[in-house]
Amino acid sequence: MAFFSRKPKGPFIKTSEMTMHWDTEDPFIFVSHHEDDYPHGNAQMAPPLQEISGRNLGRDYKKTFGFRMYNGKVVPGFPMHAHWGYETITLPQTGYVDHSDCEGNTGRFGFGDVQWVSAPGFYEHCEMYPLVDQEGRNPNDITQIMIALPLEKKNLPESSVNTVWKEEMPYFETEGCRVQVICGEYNGKSVWSPSTHTWADKSHSVRILRVELDPSGKFEVGPADPKVNRNLYFVSGDKARIMGFEVIWNLHMKIDPGATVDIENGSEKSVFWLLEGEPIGQKMSMFGPILLGTDQEVRDALQTIRLEEFKRWPWDVIDRVNPIDSGRFLLRSDGTRETPPE
């Protein structure tokens, strides 16, 4: 909660406290932030049995012993599920994600890598959190961002999966400040979605920054295109002075795009996310994993998923993980293997 009066002031249009699922604006449709302190893994890369017994396995969203299993029943994470009509960006700052999909792609990424999945049409994948450390703990810090696709790009057959390795990511660093440029431009650094079907390109002024500030560190970004929706998230830390106002962490701020965002951090290390982009501005219908143009299209898509979800899945299990010693890689269905640069 900020130290504001009842109404936000100055460049702040709206403020709200944050939860695991963040408030978003067009073109962003959903953001989830998962932080879990998993224990050492067993031979299955799963938590010890005594720490998962008694849970509502398959839908465990309550932290017990410091972690959640989510939809996983053995390994934490999200077994086979559909995406339809949007693009997903996943950044595990700590921890690993094992990814397998309906097209036969599989891989492991983590510790600063960024995965882009564009799913204009019916697409299925699983995202599991393997506990690869069998002696120490396996903490996870995973942020997932979903960006809508415009109506003209929905229901196209070409989905895509790409991993941008941590070693290839653009960073901007000054004393006390480290900015990871996930999408867009910042101080001469730039990167855009590698997907064919995307809204996250230069022409739509999409920018996604992850900002780490040391105690007393400073960050600044100038005014944006007046058309964009601009949102700042104070994810961890204690206090900071943002555009002249003192706020405390766990705060979402919708900000006037014409303002310069300047942050002076307090006495603890802090993490902020900045999400901005030109809104698509089209009426859409969403239910569960589907974002299409009309309610009827969504109903038809749900029926397709019910009839086809297991027929399209090429793997033996719906919660697939890779071997414990796999390292970070992306193995495409055509046999092409991609790994981080040496």
Predicted feature residues:
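Jelly-roll (double-stranded beta-helix
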Residues: 1-342
